[in-house]
């Protein structure tokens, strides 16, 4: 009986009101830190999505991963604390958060894997940089040809003018393709590009096939410029198809945002529950825990 009394007395000492208040405060602080780290991870992820360079994207992505790692570390520590003593409601709320956080991590992993690629930004840079220059060189060569051969046969002029017009259409189709998220819509755009490409090639090949134009420097320049443009267009379409910037932005604004709110709501509910848990009072005199009446001496 004495052993039982000592054990109960020891337990009460271990879980005194002051100590339970300290545990409650520590758990509340842990949940608060989880909420802050979760918000920091979300902000860093958004910065990674919106960054325009690979290096900046990687820097922000690393910050997001570090913040989510902190959330996970705190979640495990809180789980260990709950295993020692916690109400079933607290454990259930932590389990709810854990499920939501697992989904958050899955989305985060897929999203951050996209952010460092910046394929849409690179496609735009090619389209408005080297590709635009190659198209301009081709157009200028055809303009010189038309001015120089203004009195030539109508068929010859139509070949040059047709190639020039098709090139302009083809060039203007690139930016909408880069900004498009739908694969079927991109298929339609590429079909129109292929049609324009065939017309440009038909015009240039038709000019080069004429015996008196085989040595024409402007025709040669136009064909060389269009060859460079075609190579760049292939690269642009490949980058555009990956759509890493648009896909990561869509995920950030939809799936990630919803997962973030789910986790924050779960943590808020858990924080409220921890604060609401009652603290049992310890006996004022542990001697009263002994069994039987005091018999005196």
Specify the residue positions occupied by each region the protein language model found.
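A structural signal for well-ordered alpha-helices, especially hydrophobic packing surfaces
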Residues: 2, 14, 38, 42-45, ...
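Amphipathic alpha-helical segments and their boundaries
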Residues: 2-41, 82-101, 120, 124-168, ...
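Transmembrane helix-loop junctions in multipass membrane proteins, especially transporters and channels
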Residues: 11-15, 52, 181
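Extracellular/periplasmic ligand-sensing ectodomains of membrane signal-transduction proteins
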Residues: 53, 57, 87, 101-102, ...
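Alpha-helical segments in soluble extracytoplasmic regions
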Residues: 53-81, 183-209
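Transmembrane helix-bundle signature of multi-pass membrane transporters/permeases
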Residues: 63, 130, 192, 254-255
């Amino acid at each position: 009986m004495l052993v039982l009394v000592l054990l109960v007395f020891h337990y009460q000492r271990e879980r005194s009101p002051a100590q339970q208040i300290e545990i409650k405060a520590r758990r509340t602080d842990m949940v608060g830190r989880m909420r802050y780290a979760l918000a920091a991870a979300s902000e860093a992820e958004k910065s990674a999505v919106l960054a325009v360079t690979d290096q900046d994207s990687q820097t922000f992505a690393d910050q997001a991963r570090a913040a989510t790692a902190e959330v996970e570390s705190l979640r495990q520590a809180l789980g260990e604390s709950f295993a020692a003593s916690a109400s079933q409601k607290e454990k259930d709320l932590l389990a709810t958060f854990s499920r939501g956080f697992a989904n958050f991590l899955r989305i985060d992993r897929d999203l951050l894997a996209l952010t460092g690629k910046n394929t849409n930004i690179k496609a735009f840079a090619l389209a408005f940089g080297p590709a635009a220059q190659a198209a301009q060189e081709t157009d200028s060569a055809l303009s010189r040809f038309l001015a120089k051969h203004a009195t030539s046969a109508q068929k010859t002029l139509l070949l040059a003018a047709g190639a020039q017009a098709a090139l302009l259409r083809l060039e203007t189709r690139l930016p909408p393709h880069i900004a498009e998220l739908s694969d079927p819509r991109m298929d339609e755009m590429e079909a129109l590009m292929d049609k324009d490409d065939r017309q440009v090639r038909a015009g240039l090949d038709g000019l080069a096939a004429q015996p008196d134009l085989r040595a024409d420097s402007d025709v040669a320049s136009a064909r060389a410029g269009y060859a460079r443009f075609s190579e760049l267009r292939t690269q642009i379409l490949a980058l555009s198809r990956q759509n890493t910037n648009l896909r990561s932005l869509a995920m950030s604004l939809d799936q990630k945002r919803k997962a973030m709110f789910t986790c924050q709501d779960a943590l808020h509910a858990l924080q409220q529950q921890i604060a609401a848990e009652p603290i049992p009072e310890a006996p004022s005199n542990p001697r009263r825990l002994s069994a039987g009446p005091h018999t005196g001496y």
